[in-house]
Swiss-Prot record:
Ranges for domain WSC: 116-210
Transmembrane segments: 393-413
Protein name: Kremen protein 1
Chain intervals for the UniProt region annotation (Essential for apoptotic activity): 414-473
GO molecular function, one term: transmembrane signaling receptor activity
GO cellular component, one term: plasma membrane
Primary localisation category: membrane
Topology, Cytoplasmic side: 414-473
Organism: Rattus norvegicus
Keywords of this entry: Cell membrane, Disulfide bond, Glycoprotein, Kringle, Membrane, Signal, Transmembrane, Transmembrane helix, Wnt signaling pathway
Record's subunit section: Forms a ternary complex with DKK1 and LRP6. Interacts with LRP6 in a DKK1-dependent manner. Interacts with DKK1 and RSPO1 (via FU repeats).
Length: 473
């Protein structure tokens, strides 16, 4: 046995090595929800993003078994393209290549985005210590779900498969400590299902044991819920409940990325988590829409299967949405002028008219004038180039008052003159007494001259008001 000092040095070195090794980064958004990528419909056309080989077009591979001539209706995702696909149910997407290696004319595609949720990746296993240090077993009928179910029954969080027949369990958070490997290095087929990948030699493929569980509780903003026993076919006589409760969510968006239920007696239901009222029901005859929303923050997912038929099941992706409370709109900054006017006639009017142009505007140096029943208006620049100030309104009002006063004065003057004329006529009648004709002429003539002079005196307003208008100077 090594001395304590040596053991301490070894532990310190191991700790430093572990701390220096970065944990796996965030996975890209999943483009696959099956274990073997049979549902991949992406656009990668190389066997690997770095150092890969270009794929051949599926409509040019007539010498090979899979081409658009044999599958003209897009079966398996084939078409007039060279994207990686998995039309034959292999362990991962692949494509034909032009360069043959030892008579092999196709290659698997390394697609980072084609990794089903719950698949934690492919990692190196040097065996000292292994990535998962819990219990283990081997089986010549091993599948992904048989290993996951075994580890879940032992209350482990992670399940790993190697070489197609070995199953490892554990709770080790540092399962990645020996390094991550390419997904194509874990493509050894499972002994119990040749369409599923079960690791490789010295390579372990890891899964979360929640995958394929019959029931569970979810509270995250987004997750994927699989049917029981997924990716294997679901068993008969299953009754499972999953609660999806996201406090504060205004709605939950559901998307069934996989739905393979062939029996009308097998069903999937969504229930109101508070009242247990059935919201929607889907079965072999009534398939779910592409996506839909439920305006609740608590939903129960229910699955039932009878004792007759089996199928792959379902994978449903949910995404909760929280609507933030409306924020108060900040005060509008009044430093920029907003001019709303007819630009077509503005320049012509400004060049040939002296009228004042009014525009909607706001300026820190000229506070807006409030006019009842309208916007805040400020006079703009006229044709003369001088700004009409705000007091122009008061000048116009004063001019209007003076005009009204002048009109009223003129009316009063006219009434006064009429009354004086009536009085003069009466005096003339009183003066027409018997006498000579020359005296009558003199009396008649003098008032006429006097009245004319009186009018001039009224315009000049230089005489006393109490004088008789018929008396001349």
């Amino acid at each position: 046995m090594a001395p304590p000092a040596a053991r301490l040095a070894l532990l310190s070195a191991a700790a430093l090595t572990l701390a220096a090794r970065p944990a796996p980064g965030p996975r890209p958004s999943p483009e696959c929800f099956t274990a073997n990528g049979a549902d991949y419909r992406g656009t990668q056309s190389w066997t690997a993003l770095q150092g890969g080989k270009p794929c051949l077009f599926w409509n040019e591979t007539f010498q090979h078994p899979y081409n658009t001539l044999k599958y003209p209706n897009g079966e398996g995702g084939l078409g007039e393209h060279n994207y990686c696909r998995n039309p034959d149910g292999d362990v991962s997407p692949w494509c034909y290549v032009a360069e043959h290696e030892d008579g092999v004319y196709w290659k698997y595609c390394e697609i980072p985005a084609c990794q089903m949720p719950g698949n934690l990746g492919c990692y190196k296993d040097h065996g000292n210590p292994p990535p998962l240090t819990g219990t283990s077993k081997t089986s010549n009928k091993l599948t992904i779900q048989t290993c996951i179910s075994f580890c879940r029954s032992q209350r482990f969080k992670f399940a790993g498969m190697e070489s197609g027949y070995a199953c490892f369990c554990g709770n080790n958070p540092d399962y990645w400590k020996h390094g991550e490997a390419a997904s194509t290095e874990c493509n050894n087929v499972c002994f119990g299902d040749h369409t599923q990948p079960c690791g490789g030699d010295g390579r372990i493929i890891l899964f979360d044991t929640l995958v394929g569980a019959c029931g569970g509780n979810y509270s995250s903003m987004a997750a994927v819920v699989y049917s029981p026993d997924f990716p294997d076919t679901y068993a008969t006589g299953r009754v499972c409940y999953w609660t999806i409760r996201v406090p504060g969510a205004s709605r939950i968006h559901f998307n069934f990325t996989i739905f393979d239920i062939r029996d009308s007696a097998d069903m999937v239901e969504l229930l109101d988590g508070y009242t247990h009222r059935v919201l929607v029901r889907f079965d072999g005859r009534s398939r779910p829409p592409l996506s839909f929303n439920v305006s609740l923050d608590f939903v129960i997912l229910y699955f039932f299967s009878d004792r007759i038929n089996q199928a792959q099941g379902f994978a449903v992706l949910y995404q909760a949405t929280k609507e933030e409370p409306p924020q108060e709109r900040p005060a509008i900054n009044q430093t920029l002028a907003e001019v709303i006017t007819e630009q077509a006639n503005l320049s012509v009017s400004a060049a040939h008219s002296s009228k004042v142009l009014y525009v909607i505007t706001s300026s820190p140096s000229h506070p807006p004038q409030t006019v009842p029943g309208s916007h805040s208006w400020v006079p703009s620049v006229g044709a003369s180039g001088h700004r009409v100030e705000g007091w122009t309104v008061y000048g116009l009002a004063t001019l209007l008052i003076l005009t009204v006063t002048a009109v009223v004065a003129k009316i009063l003057l006219h009434v006064t003159f009429k009354s004086h004329r009536v009085t003069a006529s009466g005096d003339l009648r009183d003066c027409r007494q018997p006498g000579t004709s020359g005296e009558i002429w003199t009396i008649f003539y003098e008032p006429s001259t006097t009245i004319s002079i009186f009018k001039k005196k009224l315009k000049g307003q230089s005489q006393q008001d109490d004088r008789n208008p018929l008396v001349s100077d």
